[in-house]
């Protein structure tokens, strides 16, 4: 068994943060680390070592394509999560998401990501598409995500937005969706963050299906 530092930048004074998570010593598969012809700007960073077979900037011009390979219980377990740091006193961003090729159990969206996180995403369940908001907190060492709201949609293109407010230690994140990129609807509860320098992250995972 190996130990990997994955919470080294979570400086939280309110409680002790576990510095190590266990992971299996899984050999790297052929091609995982090979250059795939795509070049990201230096402002981007991966949450884990990426699998270069599963992302691309060249397969579809003007788009970042993310694929899944393993079933994950939470976003924290996913390898190809890519992000930028937030900045204060306020910041926000939105993404346009093409969900036409998503499969049963897939979840793709936009997260305010740190030790405690939340995200707005499209989820495929029972053949239907839903916009969902999901929170995660590991208080009392209970590690699980819980859904706070869902809205069924039929569209294959949606816009997802996260706004962050750090003024006067407010530290809140707000989640929105749009079907046309102009008219926005707030979804889910406001997320109370516990860390200033979290990430705005693009996520794509496959959850266990019933």
Indicate residue ranges for each PLM-predicted region:
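Carbohydrate-binding surfaces in secreted/extracellular proteins
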Residues: 35, 95, 159-189
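Extracellular glycan-recognition surfaces and repeat-rich motifs
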Residues: 40-67
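Short carbohydrate-recognition loop motifs
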Residues: 57-75, 130-135
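Secretory/extracellular carbohydrate-interaction modules
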Residues: 72-128
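Short, aromatic/His-centered strand-loop micro-motif at the edge of beta-sheets
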Residues: 138-159
